[in-house]
Every structure is written in C-alpha cells, then in structure tokens.
Amino acid sequence: MVKFVASDLDGTLLLNGAQSVDESTIQYINKLVDKGVIFAPASGRQITSLKRLFGAVSDKLAYIAENGALVEYKGETIGKTAMDRKLALEIIEDVIEQPNCEVLVSGEHTSYIKPKSQEYYYRMTKVVNYHTTLVDKFTDIDEDILKIAVCDMTGIKNSKEHFINKWSDKASVLVSGELYLDLMDTNVNKGRGIEQVQQYFGLKPEQCMAFGDNYNDIAMLDKVYYSYVMEKAVEDVKKHGRFVTGW
C-alpha cells in the first residue's frame, strides 16, 4: 500500500509555466491526506513559496524544499543541510560575474537577491511569488545558506556548462528548469530528502511514489518503487522511472 507520495512542481504538477495549483488538485491531495497518505511537494523552490501554493492544505503536508536541503513535516524540521559558507560566497561571486545570470540565495524562510534587472526582480517577486530580501552585499546574510540558484534569462542551456565544469567537484549542481540551475552541498538532492522522510516515518521504497520530469528529480525517482516520469521528459530522466505519465 502506498503511504507516501512526493511530486515535483514545475513541469510536473505545474504545467506550461503555471504558478498556482488548481483547486481540483488541492482537493485530491486533501483526500489523500485524509486517508492517511503523506503528501510532499518536492521542489527546488523555497518552503515559504511552497506553503503559499498549497493554501488550505499547506499545514497538512510534508515539504522537500530547496531540492532537499530543507525537509519539514507539519512545522517540524526533519532535515536541514547548509552549504559551506566560504564556498557559497565564492559561487555567488562567480554567478554575479556572468553577464546574463542572476543569483538567488536561499536561507530557511527567505531568499536573498540583488537584481541586475527589473525583469528578474519582477519574476521572483510577482511571477514565482518568492519571499525575498534585498541585500547590498551577500556577505551580510546572517543565516545558513541552503542553496544558490542561477537564473539565466536567455535560457540555462547557455550557461550551465560553465557552472557544471567549475563547481561540480565541490557542490551538487543540478539543472532545475529552462532558466534555472541549482547549487547545493554535495550531500543534497531530492533523493536525500525522500530518504529523510522514509526514515522519519519508517517507510520502505515499496510504500512510496514519486513524480518528476527533470534532472533534479532523478535521485528522488531512484528512492521509490512507484516512480513516474512525465512523458515529455528527456530520455535520460525517463530511464529512472518505472512508469511514464502525461497526467
């Protein structure tokens, strides 16, 4: 019997650039939870943004946020993995130096930005609807850094090789969308988040289900038996799913 369901958001639960979860999905999730199934959005997004998305059921869910750097269930932190601060600041400086790239730095409940363009500021605060804090210097951040997100407004395909080649031996580097690439501690991925939920509730992979579509979902798909990949996903990701779905 399935007791835990995790789903990626962008490209999976949210299709075609949608930035809100439709009411029918919320109602279905509520029915699952009422039957004793644990549901967790598993996303590169911040936890504050995730809770806004799920509205009326937000306090009933588990959360695998920041690609697994922060895991929470009903307000209790199950897992939290921060980046080495010195390394994080070096990566931030590198992102800033890239002409088409913006940086977003994740704390536990807010994300820090110093926008180069009004377009990026609007996207993060109005489109994605993140809780953001403007900073003059990223060295002023006085909490743990959980994740660094690179946003290339021309498409992350144009800059991903730079970050993969430069940082993949020191950090976990994952493409998380058409515009985004995430860097975390080497131990962080959605699969680790799934493991922490499984350990907390004493669940086996055969009791777990996950849905995903992108490279940052692979580790999560590998940790459950019922692994569903979206039909539009690239073949490298589809290899990690037992099932293919188009909703």
Region locations from a protein language model:
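Conserved acidic, metal-coordinating active-site core of Asp-based
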Residues: 90, 94, 99-211, 217-220, ...
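Asp-based phosphoryl-transfer active-site loop
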Residues: 3-18, 221
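Asp-based, Mg2+/Mn2+-dependent phosphohydrolase catalytic module
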Residues: 223, 227-247
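Hydrophobic packing residues within well-ordered alpha-helices of enzyme cores
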Residues: 50-54, 160-163, 221, 237
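Active-site phosphate-binding/coordination module
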Residues: 23-119
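Hydrophobic residues within well-ordered alpha-helices
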Residues: 32, 67, 194, 220-224
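Short, structured coil segments at secondary-structure junctions
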Residues: 56-59, 67, 166-169, 223-224, ...
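Short active-site oxyanion
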Residues: 36-40, 59-61, 146-147, 206-207, ...
